[in-house]
């Protein structure tokens, strides 16, 4: 018996569940992935969608607890971030050469997607949850300076509100602008023209007039429009192919959701899925569940 104990060891890597929020980009966790033929079938379907060989842009990944769904998605995001460790690629190549060929194709074409990880937040609507996840993804990847059209329109809306309802705040804002050698009319004109410098100035002054709060236009906007605009900026200005959204623990969200607001949240999810399906490989949306959606009804 002692001899067997010296020969057989438990791989501790199997004992720790993958947390996408914490483990994304962690090469150590990614390198511990062990490809199987069944998991490669799933990975291959995702990669074929990315390369345009399949049209599955909005999907639900279903499997029981401990099946390796999150670890598989961790590897997928690594591929779509052009950051897959070579050791994992070699393991994929041995297990499934066809999937490895798709990985190689994505590497050659430099198909890079911004990963957006969605988690349910009690008390928040699905609109807010999706926007929060997008803002967090942009910040984490050094893309906070991306300015969608909603940022300019929201700044103009706030200025109009200050002018009509908070004259003292508006007057102080005008004074600050004078210190920066400009005036409110010029600022408004430049905001309408989508000048980034004017938006940066507004963002700089905003905390001085709102007790230190941060200007967060994404959190005040409409989900579909915001994602459309961010995708446009990512593809035209930042070298990305688009966005890949993963709603991990979607099961817990469904099980814990109160009846109030449920229909509206489901409509938001449906709209996002429809946007993904019509996005021409620029948006993918995957929800992770432990059983069929019909079983939750």
Put a short name on every predicted segment:
Residues 227-237, 264-284:
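Substrate-engagement module of ASCE P-loop NTPases
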